[in-house]
Amino acid sequence: MKKLAIVFTMLLIAGCSSSQDSANNQIDELGKENNSLFTFRNIQSGLMIHNGLHQHGRETIGWEIVPVKTPEEALVTDQSGWIMIRTPNTDQCLGTPDGRNLLKMTCNSTAKKTLFSLIPSTTGAVQIKSVLSGLCFLDSKNSGLSFETGKCIADFKKPFEVVPQSHLWMLNPLNTESPII
């Protein structure tokens, strides 16, 4: 009887550990399916920072947010850390060669031209700050990559300062057609 209890306990423990491994594998598979591609849309105009559009204006590629190791001293001003906004499965990133204009560039975190910081707001939208210039991207009259820059509204001494809608961007799912099931 004692041997039976020991065998039963060992099987129970072995069964629990393998089910945990199975659960971890399911989570990994879920992560592969949910690849977190975004479009960035301005709150004021709805214009997006597009990456690749097809003939009907739907986004075909989207953007991928890639975290970058942020130096400790930079975390004082960029509390959410630095990111690169990358075209998936490539070495092409959204970048600012001069800190003011947006272009697709080769991803390179050392020159800071492809580094950004997202400044969250209470609305769920964010300001997109260029690490190179310290300026934020604002709404524009033209869709695409031609956006103005301006002073970021992020003073921790004035937490209730209103951020203009032209400064705020939403991270939205891709603007693609849904498949018919």
UniProtKB/Swiss-Prot annotation:
A lipid is attached at C16 (N-palmitoyl cysteine). GO terms for molecular function: carbohydrate binding; toxin activity. It is found in: Cell outer membrane. It comes from the Bacteria. Its main location: membrane. One of its GO terms (cellular component) is cell outer membrane. Coiled coil: none annotated. The keyword Transferase does not apply. Disulfide bonds: none annotated. Residues 1-15 form the signal peptide. Pfam families: CDtoxinA. Part of the tripartite complex that is required for the CDT activity. CdtC, along with CdtA, probably forms a heterodimeric subunit required for the delivery of CdtB. Heterotrimer of 3 subunits, CdtA, CdtB and CdtC. This is Cytolethal distending toxin subunit C. The gene is cdtC.
